[in-house]
Amino acid sequence: FKKFYDRSNPPKQQRMRSSLGSGVMMTDDGYVLTNHHVVDGADAIVLQLQDGREAAATLIGTDPEIDLAVLKINLENISPIQLSTQKAKVGDVVLAIGNPFGVGQSVSQGIISATQRKGLGLNTFENFIQTDAAINPGNSGGPLVDSAGNLVGINSAILDRTSYAMGISFAIPASTAVKVLKDIIIHGKAIRGWLGVNASQLRPHAAKKLGLDPPLGLVITNIYEASPAFFAGLLPGDVIVRINNNGVIDNDKAMNVIADLSPGDSVKLDVLRNGKRKIIDAVAGTRPEIN
């Protein structure tokens, strides 16, 4: 991708600035996935295919909370990538494809170092595949594929741009990216479940005092008015132990479990209130858009 910025300072002196990124052809009718940060703020986006053809791309929608964007081009005879049917596992060989530093399409090889990485502070929702395949500026938004060329993830970030973080790169899982793709095509935005609470993790001594095995448990600190949690009868001070039978160990996991729900889905909450176990049934709402 090339994204162009038209900046005027002073008004009579216009300068055009461009940057590069990569993307993945997801459908045969021209829908493309890339990173939100690759196209954020762009006045025009041009996509170049491997065969050398170029086309202006239309931005269909973005999801800043997970750093994905959907583009659309109008070209014939385009081949979408195939999705991997295997769950990503530590030790799997993967290939990162992109356009590092604008030098042209390149492939780097690595292995999956970890899965379900979260708590990195990169995105609101994190469930990264960690790999040691070389990722550089220009690779963002490109595919991470298995040895058969099937999509495993969307390359998104490196931990740091210093030599101390070499070999630590992150990709958004293909299953997550495909869900966002479908949401944006249908709704123009990502659709996620929402309860409407703020919570903090129980300290180990507090968890033990309540008979929980640390780090299990989140204590509710605030409930949004007229939210699903409000209507379900949750109260500040309630300790959420499980959500739909998933043990709650931290805010990141709880957010991911709720966000993966569709609005209208039932939510079974196992909570502690005043030292007594209680089951509360709620109905997931729609997560508000973050500006």
Predicted regions, residues:
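Short strand-turn-strand beta-turns centered on an Asx-Gly dipeptide
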Residues: 243-248, 274
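Conserved catalytic motifs of ABC-family nucleotide-binding domains
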Residues: 237
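Serine-dependent protease modules
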Residues: 1-209, 213-216, 221-225, 232, ...
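Conserved "HGTGT" condensation-loop signature of ketosynthase/thiolase-family condensing enzymes
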Residues: 240
